[in-house]
């Protein structure tokens, strides 16, 4: 076991796959000589050369389209968005090409493409660089969507994403790159379509992902001190949602709290609520509750930025409120 930062875990995953497979390449702004905006591709340029770690102009639509073409002609490109918000400029390529080509070609084309990079709220990057685009991409047919949350799952998930023959959008939170964790030195892979049970419990199911996983963990001491026993699930796969694993938990706890950084309107939580109500309505003792970011552009001011995101104290209050309301009905 070795303790490494999350950005190093992502770099190690990329390095290992590039060493094993000469078709794996990295494309994006400053991924080469500079080593990536958060150093995920540091030193890969000197090891693999200009053609496999390709610096591009500031033209997301162009290099994303180039990567899609490379994927259908035999390469396994990894596109790094310097900030995931920039990929709005490549939305046409991602939606009309990456998401659809395997279907519209009748299966004649595979599209082994990873689109990854930093996103989420933090570091006072302002409204345009702090968007939560998970739900935007969730609506595109043909994409798989993953959100890593620890060095361990970041490495295992990225290696699996690189080897997948379908396009994978891989979200990394800007505030988690310096998170440290011990990970195995031997090679490992993690499934792209499964949740992670962070904590087993019996009172309530808390569904979360990315940075909010850590806010939920921060809320646990206060909840445990007062005798609450929550089950915590990191979704990891945002598309497809692992409704089978979620069902196991809901059938045990009968109560659900969703904690997300995505905005409330048409967010990941909204789709979760729809599927839980569709498949598990009879298992619920109370309506599903979601804690989401406010439906406003992210402020630049640090205090205001923080106020738009769900905090551990809000999670504690919501868990207590849900469980208390159910007990009141029962008694």
From Swiss-Prot:
Its cofactor is thiamine diphosphate. It holds the Pfam family Transketolase_C. GO terms for molecular function: metal ion binding; pyruvate dehydrogenase (acetyl-transferring) activity. It comes from the Eukaryota. Thiamine diphosphate binds at residue 60. Keywords: Chloroplast, Metal-binding, Oxidoreductase, Plastid, Potassium, Pyruvate, Thiamine pyrophosphate. One of its GO terms (cellular component) is chloroplast. Its EC number is 1.2.4.1. It catalyses: N(6)-[(R)-lipoyl]-L-lysyl-[protein] + pyruvate + H(+) = N(6)-[(R)-S(8)-acetyldihydrolipoyl]-L-lysyl-[protein] + CO2. It is an enzyme of class 1 (oxidoreductase). It is found in: Plastid, Chloroplast. CDD domains: TPP_PYR_E1-PDHc-beta_like. K(+) binds at residues 113, 161-162, 164, 166. PANTHER family: PYRUVATE DEHYDROGENASE E1 COMPONENT BETA SUBUNIT, PYRUVATE DEHYDROGENASE E1 COMPONENT SUBUNIT BETA. Heterodimer of an alpha and a beta chain. The pyruvate dehydrogenase complex catalyzes the overall conversion of pyruvate to acetyl-CoA and CO(2). It contains multiple copies of three enzymatic components: pyruvate dehydrogenase (E1), dihydrolipoamide acetyltransferase (E2) and lipoamide dehydrogenase (E3). This is Pyruvate dehydrogenase E1 component subunit beta. The gene is pdhB.
């Amino acid at each position: 076991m070795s303790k490494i930062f999350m950005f190093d875990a992502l770099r190690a995953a990329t390095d290992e796959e590039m060493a094993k497979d000469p078709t794996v390449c990295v494309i994006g702004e400053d991924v080469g000589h500079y080593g990536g905006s958060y150093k995920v591709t540091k030193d890969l340029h000197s090891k693999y050369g200009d053609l496999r770690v390709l610096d591009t102009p500031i033209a997301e639509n162009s290099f994303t389209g180039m990567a899609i073409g490379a994927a259908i002609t035999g390469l396994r490109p990894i596109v790094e968005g310097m900030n995931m918000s920039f990929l709005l400029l490549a939305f046409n390529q991602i939606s009309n090409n990456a998401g659809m080509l395997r279907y519209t070609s009748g299966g004649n084309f595979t599209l082994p493409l990873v689109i990854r990079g930093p996103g989420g709220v933090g570091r006072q990057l302002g409204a345009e660089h702090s968007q939560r685009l998970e739900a935007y991409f969730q609506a595109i047919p043909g994409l798989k969507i993953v959100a890593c949350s620890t060095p361990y799952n970041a490495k295992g998930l990225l290696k699996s994403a690189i080897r997948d023959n379908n396009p994978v959008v891989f979200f990394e939170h800007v505030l988690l790159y310096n998170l440290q964790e011990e990970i195995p030195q031997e090679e490992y892979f993690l499934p792209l379509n499964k949740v992670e049970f962070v904590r087993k419990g019996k009172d309530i199911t808390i569904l979360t992902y990315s940075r909010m996983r850590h806010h939920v963990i921060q809320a646990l001491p206060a909840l445990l001190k007062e005798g609450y026993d929550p089950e915590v699930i990191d979704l990891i796969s945002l598309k497809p949602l692992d409704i089978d694993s979620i069902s196991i938990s809901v059938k045990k706890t009968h109560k659900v709290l969703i904690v997300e950084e995505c905005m409330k309107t048409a967010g990941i939580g909204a789709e979760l609520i729809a599927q839980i109500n569709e498949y598990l309505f009879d298992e619920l003792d109370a309506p599903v509750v979601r804690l989401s970011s406010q439906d406003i552009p992210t402020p630049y001011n640090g205090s205001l930025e923080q106020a738009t995101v769900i905090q551990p104290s809000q999670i504690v209050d919501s868990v207590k409120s849900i469980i208390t309301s159910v007990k009141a009905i029962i008694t």
